Amino acid sequence: MNAFQWKIAIAAVLSLPTLAAAGTTQTCNDNILKGQYVLAASGFTRPAASGPGTPWVPKAILEVLNFNGDGTLTTPGVTIANPFGDTGAVLDAPVGAPGDYSISEDCSGTLRFHDINSVTYKIFVKPPLGDTIWLIQTNPANNVFQGSATRVY
């Protein structure tokens, strides 16, 4: 083997770990979310059917979510600050609405609560363990709301 062939052989051997890593893609599905998570989110809201120029007011939520690993979830506790606009109210409901979720192989998905407003979030799950979820609310309209949920057990 001449010097050029040795260089090619060494370069090929050194690049094998990189090629192996490139072939291992992270995949997700519904069972990546199991256990109890705490969601902290904030943003802005305004009354339903508000027209242009209607002021936005702050809103925040702290919520406990129990993911069952099968596409369903329950909400054993929720506290919402200023949920209905500029009232300043803080609601501490004993339980929130149940819901469902769907996670794609690329770790993106949706989460929907079975409440009167069908509150829905676009989500992204942190692979490989699913211990963090990033969320942005997509329904109902007149909400700009985002946050993250962290597995606590």
Residue ranges, per PLM feature:
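Bacterial N-terminal signal peptides
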Residues: 9-18
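Mature soluble binding/inhibitory domains
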Residues: 21-153
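Bacterial N-terminal signal peptides that target proteins for export
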Residues: 1-10
